[in-house]
């Protein structure tokens, strides 16, 4: 999967996100606008790996916040409540266990 090409395609189509299966993993590409705030979420049976492709992205947990920039990543533990926000806009790749 070519992330640069995929994000460019999303931008050209005016879309914010796309999800594709890849080797048993769901890969979700998200273009987060400046000031964008996601909803609180949790995953009861899988971790979620968050990779920031570009920009600044905050992964907020109930008890702490991680600020990530392009090229950085973190893993959201199974069951952890979290949400993503971006003060300046970001392109983010999310990896979770694929749906059976």
Task: Give names to the regions the model predicted.
Residues 1-33, 39-40:
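A short, N-terminal "cap"/entry segment at the start of jelly-roll beta-barrel domains
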Residues 18-21, 38-44, 61, 85-86:
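Short histidine-centered beta-strand/loop micro-motifs
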Residues 42-59:
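Short, conserved beta-strand element in jelly-roll/cupin
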Residues 53-54, 69-70, 88:
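A cytosolic small-molecule/anion-sensing beta-strand core signal
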Residues 56-58, 65, 81, 91:
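Structural motif
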Residues 63-78:
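Short acidic-glycine-tyrosine-enriched beta hairpin
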Residues 78-100:
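Ligand-binding loop in jelly-roll beta-barrel domains
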């Amino acid at each position: 999967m070519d992330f640069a090409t995929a994000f460019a395609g999303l931008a050209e189509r005016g879309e914010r996100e796309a999800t594709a299966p890849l080797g048993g993993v769901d890969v979700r590409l998200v273009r987060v606008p400046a000031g964008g705030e996601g909803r609180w979420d949790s995953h009861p049976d899988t971790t979620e790996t968050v990779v920031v492709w570009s920009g600044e992205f905050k992964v907020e947990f109930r008890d702490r916040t991680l600020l990530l920039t392009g090229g950085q990543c973190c893993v959201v533990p199974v069951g952890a409540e979290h949400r993503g926000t971006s003060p300046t806009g970001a392109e983010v790749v999310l990896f979770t266990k694929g749906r059976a």
